[in-house]
Amino acid sequence: MAWALKLPLADEVIESGLVQDFDASLSGIGQELGAGAYSMSDVLALPIFKQEESSLPPDNENKILPFQYVLCAATSPAVKLHDETLTYLNQGQSYEIRMLDNRKLGELPEINGKLVKSIFRVVFHDRRLQYTEHQQLEGWRWNRPGDRILDIDIPMSVGIIDPRANPTQLNTVEFLWDPAKRTSVFIQVHCISTEFTMRKHGGEKGVPFRVQIDTFKENENGEYTEHLHSASCQIKVFKPKGADRKQKTDREKMEKRTPHEKEKYQPSYETTILTECSPWPEITYVNNSPSPGFNSSHSSFSLGEGNGSPNHQPEPPPPVTDNLLPTTTPQEAQQWLHRNRFSTFTRLFTNFSGADLLKLTRDDVIQICGPADGIRLFNALKGRMVRPRLTIYVCQESLQLREQQQQQQQQQQKHEDGDSNGTFFVYHAIYLEELTAVELTEKIAQLFSISPCQISQIYKQGPTGIHVLISDEMIQNFQEEACFILDTMKAETNDSYHIILK
């Protein structure tokens, strides 16, 4: 017997009405209902939904970092949502940075009861200034003799051990500390942001800096070289009390904005949390520029005295290479990715050795990393250097060189084939990117291990032996791979020299 459930008449009427209402509510989906109708795509495109979507952290942001560094200074309220925070500091004022241990139970047990080493740096935020950091810091050193860019306020600091400030690294300090104990370090930044701007008409904006902290643990040999954690934040430094005035100005500007405009900006926080970043590379540049302060050997400038041999000239420092090799282990490959600013892809390439990475084609890395980072990674893997804008060759003139040149001229009169006594002269290549007289001065000074301040002027020997002052425009008109002999004259007023390109 089949059983059928029969609804009363009233229930059947209700059910029929509900079905009709539901059908009616669905009938308009996907159709244009009129000028005032909303489409679902328009609704999802509203800023509120976009913000909620972008605020969802990716998987790698959910991880708890082993350490956290907190700068006790308020962030600016004039920073837009999703932009990095910006913090204003006063020149020479002591600011506390709290060193916090965030490790979970059982995480990094090898540092329990041991010290770690943290290195603090003040570096440039702008990529353009990062490329010329050596020149910028050297210029600051000569304008502010005896001063440092970064210092530790030792009396106010707590829990730091063996603080050090290398006299040749003006922007770096370091110390040891125990993660299990309370540690706070007070730092002072002595340079201001406007010292590195192009002076034009006054009132210029200052360049932003970065405070970066790199922490290392001890290796088997007792050296603190194994990287644990790195974090940084963006700052601007003002003259005393200037940061307070700037913070007040930003706050007043925000108060004048409408509630809708305020939603586009971050609130001001009482402290600044340093965010995770790539470790600072041990070797910053791939050209011959030494790291600020590490080249402390200033040999005497013997160019003009005629006592140097053309066959025994000062050797420039060897070019720095950081190429990935097929024999590189997966662990070394991870370190290479960090050093070359590919930290975001270390998880993707966890098990890749050097040989695995080098086998990737251009299309492979672009598909994995995206067009911008993919091309950058491919060029880094292949060790491709950027071709300099101008290459010139220089040779140091000396008394022996003059004598040999005279001998060659005499022998050439006897031997028309030009085959003289077989001597040859060593030239050094100078690679120029900015094509300026300042850059040429620095390159020549670096080549002969002297200070740029010891070079007063650079001249080019012109027709009839006249001395033409080198300018930016003249350098821009140098021929590629032009050869010059360097001669010198003692300056009249001080211990510097004039360089003559022949």
UniProtKB/Swiss-Prot annotation:
GO terms for biological process: mRNA transcription by RNA polymerase II; positive regulation of transcription by RNA polymerase II; regulation of transcription by RNA polymerase II. GO terms for molecular function: cis-regulatory region sequence-specific DNA binding; DNA binding; DNA-binding transcription activator activity, RNA polymerase II-specific; DNA-binding transcription factor activity; DNA-binding transcription factor activity, RNA polymerase II-specific; RNA polymerase II cis-regulatory region sequence-specific DNA binding; sequence-specific double-stranded DNA binding; transcription factor binding. Ubiquitous. Expressed in brain, ovary, kidney, thymus, spleen, liver, adrenal, heart and lung (at protein level). Disulfide bonds: none annotated. Gene3D superfamilies: Transcription Factor, Ets-1. The modification Phosphoserine is found at S353. Its main location: nucleus. Changing Q234L: Significant reduction of DNA-binding activity. Residues 133-395 are annotated as: DNA-binding. It is found in: Nucleus. Residues 241-265 have a biased composition (Basic and acidic residues). It holds the Pfam family SAM_3. Residues 61-300 form the Grh/CP2 DB domain. Residues 238-268, 294-325 are annotated as: Disordered. Keywords: DNA-binding, Nucleus, Phosphoprotein, Transcription, Transcription regulation. Belongs to the grh/CP2 family. CP2 subfamily. Binds to DNA as a dimer, isoform 3 does not bind to DNA or affect the binding of isoform 1 to DNA. Interacts with UBP1 and PIAS1, and is probably part of a complex containing TFCP2, UBP1 and PIAS1. Component of the SSP (stage selector protein) complex, which appears to be a heteromer of TFCP2 and 2 copies of NFE4. Binds a variety of cellular and viral promoters including fibrinogen, alpha-globin, SV40 and HIV-1 promoters. Activation of the alpha-globin promoter in erythroid cells is via synergistic interaction with UBP1. Functions as part of the SSP (stage selector protein) complex. Facilitates the interaction of the gamma-globin genes with enhancer elements contained in the locus control region in fetal erythroid cells. Interacts by binding to the stage selector element (SSE) in the proximal gamma-globin promoter. PANTHER family: ALPHA-GLOBIN TRANSCRIPTION FACTOR CP2, TRANSCRIPTION FACTOR CP2. In PubMed:8114710 authors noted that a 10-fold molar excess of isoform 3 over isoform 1 inhibited DNA-binding. This is Alpha-globin transcription factor CP2. It comes from Homo sapiens. The lineage of its organism: Eukaryota, Metazoa, Chordata, Craniata, Vertebrata.
